[in-house]
């Protein structure tokens, strides 16, 4: 089973796509204003799903800050928010 996503890992993932150092990532920044396009967001979603965080593109697109992304991702660790039919 993959290790769960941590805040440090989340920051490192964002930093990679924003060409920053993890400690330079402003969690209050709007992801779209920060320079993340839809392809990068989808790539991040795939990476985070591998850690057990079950989120969709639409859910992240509705968030207005990286902090809101983190709140959603941390709540969904291990598929906690996944509903099965």
From Swiss-Prot:
O-(pantetheine 4'-phosphoryl)serine carried by residues: 38
Domain Carrier: 1-77
Pfam families assigned to the protein according to its UniProt record, in alphabetical order: PP-binding
Key word Phosphoprotein present: yes
UniProt GO BP: fatty acid metabolic process
Pathway assignment: Lipid metabolism; fatty acid metabolism
Keywords per UniProt: Fatty acid metabolism, Lipid metabolism, Phosphopantetheine, Phosphoprotein
Cofactor(s) demanded: pantetheine 4'-phosphate
The family this protein is said to belong to: Belongs to the acyl carrier protein (ACP) family.
Role: Acyl-carrier protein (ACP) involved in the biosynthesis of a unique class of isonitrile lipopeptides (INLPs). Is the dedicated ACP for the loading of activated acyl groups catalyzed by ScoC.
Record's protein name: Acyl carrier protein ScoB
């Amino acid at each position: 089973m993959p290790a769960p996503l941590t805040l440090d890992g989340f920051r490192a993932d964002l930093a990679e796509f924003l060409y920053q150092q993890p400690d330079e990532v402003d969690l209050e920044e709007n992801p779209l204003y920060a320079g993340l396009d839809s392809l990068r967001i989808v790539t991040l979603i795939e990476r985070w799903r591998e850690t057990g965080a079950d989120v969709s593109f639409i859910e992240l697109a509705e968030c207005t800050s990286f902090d809101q992304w983190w709140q959603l991702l941390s709540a969904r660790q291990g598929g906690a928010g996944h509903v099965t039919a």
